[in-house]
């Protein structure tokens, strides 16, 4: 199994903080937020290589960071991938980036664990990985607990087996408080469909769009994430994450 960390966006909503620094390299509780993600992955046996896909603007920054981080997590194997984009206007999009890495690194024969570099989890993801490895496709789900709040996310409903039965991005009339979040496991059977999805002219941005397309073609399982999940999309959530993870670091 290999892993892809999505870190190629330009985070325009966080300007000016992200004008000269990639969002996943912004500090949360004293360290780059991407390290919170990777420290979590460091506990999983069987992850061969972690591919961090970024853009041309920030590739050198990520490479410098990776060179230093590698000393502290020597058991992890990293590769920084430049998707070639130079601005928000010519970005490949998250699904485009996934396909770019799969194609360039010949990963079609490997199961993939995919996570956004700006999604933070307060608890271990080991349970997700163990569960997901027994499926063709699994997406992490989080109960936001509020019908108004869920309108900002990809909203799902599931059956008694945890299989997605409905998926709607930012619904006006949500039918549950479950959000599909940017943590995915795809087996080799599913990875081959990423190219099919893009070739049909579907939206290359927002990784949840692929799940929305996939669940009508294959059973997509869900795994409910416990603890705290934060999608860093604004200065407010960045500040909230800093407070939460400072408390966690003290424990």
Located regions from the model:
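N-terminal nucleotide-binding beta1-loop-alpha1 segment
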Residues: 1-20, 25-26, 77-78, 219
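Active-site metal-binding loops of divalent metal-dependent hydrolases
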Residues: 10, 118-119
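Conserved N-terminal catalytic core of the sugar/cofactor nucleotidyltransferase
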Residues: 2-5, 13, 31-115
């Amino acid at each position: 199994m290999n892993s892809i960390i999505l870190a190629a966006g330009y985070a325009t909503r966080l300007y000016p903080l992200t004008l000269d620094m990639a969002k996943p390299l912004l500090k949360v509780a004293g360290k780059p937020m991407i390290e919170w993600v990777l420290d979590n992955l460091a506990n999983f046996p069987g992850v061969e290589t972690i591919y961090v896909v970024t853009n041309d603007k920030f590739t050198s920054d990520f490479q410098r960071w990776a060179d230093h981080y590698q000393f502290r997590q020597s058991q992890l194997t990293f590769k920084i991938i430049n998707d070639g984009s130079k601005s928000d206007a010519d970005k490949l999009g998250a699904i485009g980036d996934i396909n770019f890495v799969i194609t360039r690194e010949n990963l079609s024969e490997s199961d993939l664990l995919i996570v956004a570099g700006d999604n933070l989890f307060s608890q271990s993801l080991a349970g997700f990985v163990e569960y997901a490895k027994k499926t063709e496709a699994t997406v992490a789900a989080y109960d936001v607990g509020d019908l108004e709040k869920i309108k900002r996310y990809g909203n799902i409903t599931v059956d008694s087996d945890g299989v997605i039965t409905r998926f709607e991005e930012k619904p006006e009339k949500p039918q549950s408080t479950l959000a599909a979040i940017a943590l995915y496991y795809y087996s080799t059977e599913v990875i081959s469909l990423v190219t099919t999805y893009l070739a049909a002219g579907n939206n290359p941005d927002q990784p949840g769009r692929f799940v929305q397309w996939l669940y009508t073609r294959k059973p997509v399982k869900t795994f409910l994430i416990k603890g705290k999940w934060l999608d860093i999309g604004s200065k407010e959530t960045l500040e909230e994450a800093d407070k939460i993870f400072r408390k966690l670091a003290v424990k």
